[in-house]
Amino acid sequence: MSLKRNLKNPKGKQNRSGNLYFSKHWSLHISTHLVIPDPHAHPDHNNDRADLLAKLIIDLKPDVVINLGDQFDLPSLSGYDKGKRSFVGRSYRADIDAGLEFTDRLWGPVKATKKRLPHRIYLEGNHEHRIEKALDLSPEMEGTIGFKDLDLDRHYDDVIKYDGSTPGVVEVDGIYYAHFFISGVMGRPISGEHPAYSLSTKLGSSVTAGHLHTLDYNVRTSVEGSKRHSLVAGCFFDYNSDWAGKANDLYWRGVIVKRNVENGSYDPEFVSMSQLEKIYA
């Protein structure tokens, strides 16, 4: 899917919250993207980070917001990832409510300003895809659970679902976004020690992915001088996952601002969770 927008260059104007380091940028940009990686709303953990992110969106006024998916952690359906038929209805409802609360706390304050909204895109992640896996293994649950429970259309302009068994891809301003990009015919995510470099060499375009929870960034220059940016965007949750153990220490937690986005090139700004807390908490 490709979004074609006709944006005028806005005048360089300082944001009202001039004390914010990411608001002092005198804008000459074509477009600004805000990337939200893997929020993993979970019933056992609070969603306070959504309040901080809402304040950032109000101050930043991005043109496009891309949620890379896995906002709904859905631990009640984790067994279906392993091909097991395991489901507890009450736990599923709590999982859904956690994700819905995150959505409401994120977009409620932004909409309350009654200002122009950014174009909002949601990419289905593998955790949301657990619903489809559960229905494939237990079709009798049709009507009890469903993708519609996520209520994404209420707050997002475009919802990019899985294409078969692999994440859907959307192109915006020359950047391809997906929850993850596949490494080959088996449909496994591109990963490894240097995943952004792997994305760049395998795909040959500017791409941004989530899924791995780590941060990695690579820029390559084509023979004609154009820049290809490959980004693995980290995650946006502030708790440690019990199952991850020491891998929690490897995660980068925050959001990414892309300024001056044009034809796949941009100026990145990495806004960590700790920075958001210092400014807005």
Where are these regions (language model features)?
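Acidic, glycine-rich loop-and-strand cores that form catalytic or ligand-binding grooves
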Residues: 143-152, 170-176, 197, 201-204
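Active-site neighborhood of phospho(di)ester-bond hydrolases with catalytic His/Asp-centered motifs
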Residues: 35-37, 64-70, 119-125, 177-179, ...
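Core dinuclear metal-dependent hydrolase active-site scaffold
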Residues: 6-28, 33, 168-197
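A short acidic (Asp/Glu
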Residues: 45-46, 75-79, 131-136, 188-190, ...
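N-terminal active-site segment of His-dependent metallophosphoesterases
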Residues: 1-104
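Active-site neighborhood of divalent metal-dependent phosphoester bond hydrolases
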Residues: 77-164
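Conserved beta-sheet core of the metallophosphoesterase superfamily
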Residues: 178-273
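Short, glycine/acidic-enriched loop or turn micro-motifs at the edges of active sites
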Residues: 41, 73, 128, 182, ...
